[in-house]
């Protein structure tokens, strides 16, 4: 039976934490003691030193050889059951969406998993459960913290990076290319696919038709080359988040190349380029020169506001070598359009050429600048004497999935360049595969002018093989983990506890005192940092009352209900069952909110769950405590 003294002991353990939180809130919102920059410094100290050392203190002093594995199994089973249910729900609704129904989102799967399974065990759970059920429950909470740090937060990172990888592939690759990606290589300075930094994907298509992608940060680059018929570098100047998008000749003879490079940041304005400003033609000795020729956007102001600017190769049969003219280049409108017989005739060397394709989304801040400045030079004349490669069949047929022959023709009324399939090859579907306007995230337009159901393009966008995606995600998760101080504190604390409790080794007093002086302040500083965060938010409930109510129901009802079922299934009874249910009803954890904010995945919902949940958590947990004790 719960007595008044028991309730007072719980309040005595928890109220000081709320005092620290409200002092921080008042220091910013009412008294103006701290500026936002100062708050950022305090939060940085808490994230780098206070909380990691607090985690180390609890984990290193917990005996891993006396862990309650049934309790941990019940907690883990709760998370797995909820994750499996959300996965089934997401797959069913995703299938329904592809049939034209309501949209389902991976974002909601991640958010609901965070809300229902990841409470604030470290800061709130340990002192609260100790006050309710004794010191043994505090030890159980430490065991939960270990699993959260090592397994569940890592799983969250995996899901977020998977989400980022899907978005990157959907945004930067046409649908028919995504499934052909055979490998990813990520530059060492790319830490995450969270979309906060501008990235570009540079892809090459091999003889087998598989795409090999290099992901790197966008960076402004301006390189020029010289020297007669030698291969020259293109020139590209980025706009906004600068990004080099220069089409480059491959060092593999007969290999067709896609250079797909776009930023993941939105463009500040629509493109307003003039195709005549950046048209250039270079000829090589006894070969048909390749040029990156942009296809103009849809005519009129409305067409220019569409989403995709494409540059497609133009092939021109030429005679003797001529020195490439200097920029600015001739106006394409004044140039005669090559005839089909010139491209496919017996005297044409077009089958020995290197085909280039640059796909640039105007959703990128660099697309306009690239369309204004991209210049492509012909490759060395060594390619002219090479035999026709297997990847480019004799007769002019272009393999499926790579660029076709596109030539500038007479302008239509809107100022567009007509696409001419001079070889009548399977590449006739190029315009459909790489639409002139729109992006993989935008549903295709109907003939009547209306758009199809939103989200269809994203839903139907094929992904690379599972092994390729898994390797990419593991690389990004590893890079995130090795930059997180909590990773080191949790692992080092776990290793030390295994050693110290196995051989009864005590930590040197100097090291122990150095850690304690900061870890003792960790609990209060964590709550103080949470109060600063609350004060800096414009509203406590930032996601709307309906969504906030739903989030609170998931947090305080769904989680405890599921863990009650899994605990009973595992065989927990009595006080252990009560501890499992109450810890599932703790307020929302802070780490899931940090992830949601970083990856821009429903941050308003998680913010409300942290702030508002902290305010109502104390009466709710006490209510659970009283009801379970009856």
From Swiss-Prot:
Cell compartment(s), UniProt: Membrane
UniProt keywords, alphabetically: Auxin signaling pathway, Membrane, Transmembrane, Transmembrane helix, Transport
Cellular component annotations (GO), alphabetically ordered: auxin efflux carrier complex; endoplasmic reticulum; plasma membrane
Residues involved in (indol-3-yl)acetate binding: 51, 120, 122, 153, 590-591
Extracellular membrane side: 1-6, 60-70, 130-139, 512-514, 571-574
Tissue specificity field: Expressed in roots, leaves, shoot apex and panicles. Expressed in roots, stem bases and young panicles.
Membrane topology: Multi-pass membrane protein
Compositionally biased residues, Pro residues: 325-335
Gene Ontology terms, MF aspect: auxin efflux transmembrane transporter activity; identical protein binding; protein homodimerization activity
Keyword Transmembrane helix: yes
Function: Acts as a component of the auxin efflux carrier. Involved in the basipetal polar auxin transport which contributes to the spreading growth of the tillers.
Similarity-based family: Belongs to the auxin efflux carrier (TC 2.A.69.1) family.
Something else known: Plants over-expressing PIN2 exhibit reduced height, increased tiller number and enlarged tiller angle.
Summary of subunit composition and partner proteins: Homodimer.
Protein name: Auxin efflux carrier component 2
Organism listed in the record: Oryza sativa subsp. japonica (Rice)
Lineage, opening ranks: Eukaryota, Viridiplantae, Streptophyta, Embryophyta, Tracheophyta
Gene symbol of the encoding locus: PIN2
């Amino acid at each position: 039976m719960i007595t008044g003294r028991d309730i007072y002991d719980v309040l005595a353990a928890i109220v000081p934490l709320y005092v620290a939180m409200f002092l921080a809130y008042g220091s910013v919102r009412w008294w103006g003691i701290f500026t936002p920059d100062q708050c950022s410094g305090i939060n940085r100290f808490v994230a780098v030193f206070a909380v990691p050392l607090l985690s180390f203190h609890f984990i290193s002093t917990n005996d891993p050889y006396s862990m309650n594995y049934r309790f941990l199994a019940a907690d883990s089973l709760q998370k797995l059951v909820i994750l499996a249910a959300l996965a089934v729900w997401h797959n069913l609704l995703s299938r329904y969406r592809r049939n034209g129904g309501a949209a389902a989102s991976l974002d909601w799967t991640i958010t609901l998993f965070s809300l229902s399974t990841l409470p604030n065990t470290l800061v709130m759970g340990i002192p609260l459960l100790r006050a309710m059920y004794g010191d043994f429950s505090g030890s159980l909470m430490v065991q939960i913290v270990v699993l959260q740090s090592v397994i569940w937060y890592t799983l969250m990172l995996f899901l977020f990076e998977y989400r980022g990888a899907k978005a990157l592939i959907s945004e930067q690759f046409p649908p028919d290319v995504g499934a052909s990606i055979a490998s990813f290589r990520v530059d060492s300075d790319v830490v995450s696919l969270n979309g906060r930094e501008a990235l570009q994907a540079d892809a090459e298509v091999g003889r087998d038709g598989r795409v090999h992608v290099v992901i790197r940060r966008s960076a402004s680059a301006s390189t020029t080359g010289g020297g007669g018929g030698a291969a020259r570098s293109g020139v590209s100047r980025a706009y906004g988040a600068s990004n080099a998008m220069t089409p480059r000749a491959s060092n593999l003879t007969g290999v067709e190349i896609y250079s797909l490079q776009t930023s993941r940041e939105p463009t500040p304005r629509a493109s307003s380029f003039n195709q005549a400003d950046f048209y250039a033609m270079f000829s090589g000795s006894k070969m048909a020169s390749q040029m990156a020729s942009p296809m103009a956007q849809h005519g009129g102001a409305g067409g220019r506001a569409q989403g995709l600017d494409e540059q497609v190769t133009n092939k021109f049969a030429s005679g003797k070598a001529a020195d490439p003219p200097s920029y600015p280049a001739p106006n394409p409108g004044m140039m005669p359009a090559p005839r089909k017989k010139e491209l496919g005739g017996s005297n044409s060397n077009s089958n020995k050429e290197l085909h280039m394709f640059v796909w640039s989304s105007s959703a990128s801040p660099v697309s306009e600048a690239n369309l204004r400045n991209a210049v492509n030079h012909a490759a060395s004349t060594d390619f002219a004497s090479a035999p026709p490669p297997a990847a480019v069949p004799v007769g002019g047929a272009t393999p499926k999935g790579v660029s076709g022959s596109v030539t500038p023709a007479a302008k239509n009324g809107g100022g567009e360049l007509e696409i001419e399939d001079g070889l009548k090859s399977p590449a006739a579907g190029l315009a459909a595969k790489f639409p002139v306007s729109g992006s993989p995230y935008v549903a295709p337009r109907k003939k009547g002018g209306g758009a199809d159901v939103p989200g269809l393009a994203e839903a139907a966008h094929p992904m690379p093989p599972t092994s390729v995606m898994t390797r990419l995600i593991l690389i990004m998760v590893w890079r995130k983990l090795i930059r997180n101080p909590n990773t080191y504190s949790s692992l080092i604390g776990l290793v030390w506890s295994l050693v110290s409790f196995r051989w009864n080794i005590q930590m040197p007093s100097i090291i122990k005192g150095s850690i304690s002086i900061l870890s003792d302040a960790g609990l209060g500083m964590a709550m103080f940092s949470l109060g600063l965060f609350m004060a800096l938010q414009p509203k406590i409930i930032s996601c709307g009352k309906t969504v906030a109510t739903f989030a609170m129901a998931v947090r305080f009802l769904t989680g405890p209900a599921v863990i009650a079922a899994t605990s009973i299934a595992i065989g927990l009874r009595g006080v252990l069952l009560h501890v499992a249910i109450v810890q599932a009803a703790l307020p929302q954890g802070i780490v899931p909110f940090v992830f949601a904010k970083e990856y821009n995945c429903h941050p308003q919902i998680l913010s409300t769950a942290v702030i508002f949940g902290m305010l109502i958590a104390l009466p709710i947990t006490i209510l659970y405590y009283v009801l379970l004790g009856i």
